[in-house]
Amino acid sequence: MAAEAWLWRWGWGWGQRCPGRPGLPGPGPSPTTFLHLLLLLGPVAADITDGNSEHLKREHSLIKPYQGVGSSSMPLWDFQGSTMLTSQYVRLTPDERSKEGSIWNHQPCFLKDWEMHVHFKVHGTGKKNLHGDGIALWYTRDRLVPGPVFGSKDNFHGLAIFLDTYPNDETTERVFPYISVMVNNGSLSYDHSKDGRWSELAGCTADFRNRDHDTFLAVRYSRGRLTVMTDLEDKNEWKNCIDITGVRLPTGYYFGASAGTGDLSDNHDIISIKLFQLTVERTPEEESIDWTKIEPGVNFLKSPKDNVDDPTGNFRNGPLTGWRVFLLLLCALLGVVVCAVVGAVVFQKRQERNKRFY
């Protein structure tokens, strides 16, 4: 198990990510080292490769050289709003006020397990806290629907990863830029005034703006586990940002990216999107499920992430969710039962004591 864990960490740092990032600099294991690993840990490596092998899905990927430069569309992808295609990047918004742009994949994705690598850049002339608003990455039922959430629609169905660069809530203790995750079945609204805290599942601070080197984000969804990692330090190493279990996402949704600016602005660029299929063994019962009928959601005993920032990570001042109401009612009922039992015992003893005086 120790060898397997070490090889897994090695895979995250170098081997597994390299197929999706062939141009990144940085040292890696030499062929001799890799050969020794295969000889010493052959069974472990074989199990990992067979269980989680990766395959680039070009029909869901955006890779240079782009086709359709200078036009408003390209094969497999549709543009909207201020989006502009150049030979080096797809610019969702320029560094100008009141702009919205998005890019959406033509093809619905029917993969149950996948990993997406996004090469992006957010930059502009604005100084600290005088820029905005950020990029959203989507896996949703609807596409090409403009709206107030980073250039796309609110009350969406599916998954959103927000790369937020501006703190709208002046009372927040968070450090921006900030990456957060939201899963929605259409019933939740993203609250910009609170930077989405009411509906956020998890998040992390990530200093990705105005970097003088490449910045990357990885999103992995496999067997209900959603993981978000970043590579922002030009070290060719993934750093953990978000890790959530119990996430339910259907198949047949669309991948996309959008951005928006308001009174403050930035350039929001997508350089590449690469989607990999993860081959994962499943039981016959899992294979028999109609994954297109699954409703987006998360198995949570607590409300989504802190609605009021708490350095300890505890939930404070959150809304009364169904579980909270149930637990409160259960505690109240137990309290009533305990009081009733204690009262009955005390009453009975008093009655017995009174009988002795007659």
Curated annotation (Swiss-Prot):
Q: Which residues cross the membrane?
A: 325-347
Instruction: Give residue ranges for domain L-type lectin-like.
Output: 54-278
Alphabetical list of InterPro entries matching this protein: ConA-like_dom_sf, Intracellular_Lectin-GPT, Lectin_leg, VIP36_lectin
Q: Which residues are glycosylated?
A: 185
> Keyword Ribonucleoprotein: yes or no?
no
Major site of localization recorded for this protein: Golgi
Any Gene Ontology CC annotation: endoplasmic reticulum-Golgi intermediate compartment
The residues exposed to the Cytoplasmic compartment are 348-358
List residues binding Ca(2+).
Answer: 164, 166, 168, 195
Q: Name one GO molecular function term.
A: D-mannose binding
Pfam families the record matches: Lectin_leg-like
Indicate yes or no for the key word Flavoprotein: no
Binding-site residues for a carbohydrate, renumbered to this chain? 98, 133, 166-168, 192, 262-264
Please give the cofactor(s) recorded in the UniProt entry for this protein: Ca(2+)
Which PROSITE patterns does this entry report, sorted A to Z? L_LECTIN_LIKE
Annotated protein name in UniProt? Vesicular integral-membrane protein VIP36
Whichever gene encodes this chain, its name is Lman2
